[in-house]
Amino acid sequence: MRIEKIGNATLYLGDCRDILPTLPKVDAVITDPPYGIGFPYEGYDDSLENLDALIAGFMPWCLANAERVVVTPGISNVQRYPQAAWIGAWTWETTATFGKLGYSQWQPILFYGSDLPGFGNVNGIIKSDRIHFQGGAAKIDKSAGEVHTCPKPLEFMVRLIGRFTRSGETVVDPFAGSGTTGVACHNTGRAFIGIEREPKYFDIACRRIDDAQRQGQLLPAEPAGEAQQTGLALGP
């Protein structure tokens, strides 16, 4: 098992099901797991059977050892996860034709835990959490090389971490990918523990987080455009 320590970030190369049991209790888990989309990519067979095995392998540890757990499961997988305390959504508006063609323009967010600081003012979440993306697409930082196949936008992860964790807390991402959650933790003053099974993306994550810590905040400037992404809190 390879371990890299970069400032207040620690990254593990390996399977989260093997590594999570070796970690201490943490403040939060914030992660974007595989979606079970049904075909192999990046050396992993993303079948529903493998997704179910992953959920059974990582979620019990998260719920038992983290004060808060935030998961973006994919629109078709909510029922595969344990019942959440809250279900939220991130949505986007765009002038593109995706909506007209029947593609979803929202994704669910599952929130677990009784200590959820972001839900202190539900109306505030609905009205104020707006992140703008040019053309409705995620603005991905490619300065450190190739990024992950399915990354979340840095701005989105910064908003999620800032809303549902507190400064100085520790965030674990069992599916770290190219390190977006780790960069967002740096930008918001959180410690980070990331786990990634693919060596290529592990190396990219290490470089991106190292660059973020060397250069200070890497938050990209607010891009112009009509599209907007809105954080929306829904009831349990």
Feature-to-residue mapping (PLM):
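Conserved SAM/SAH-binding loop
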Residues: 14-18, 223-232
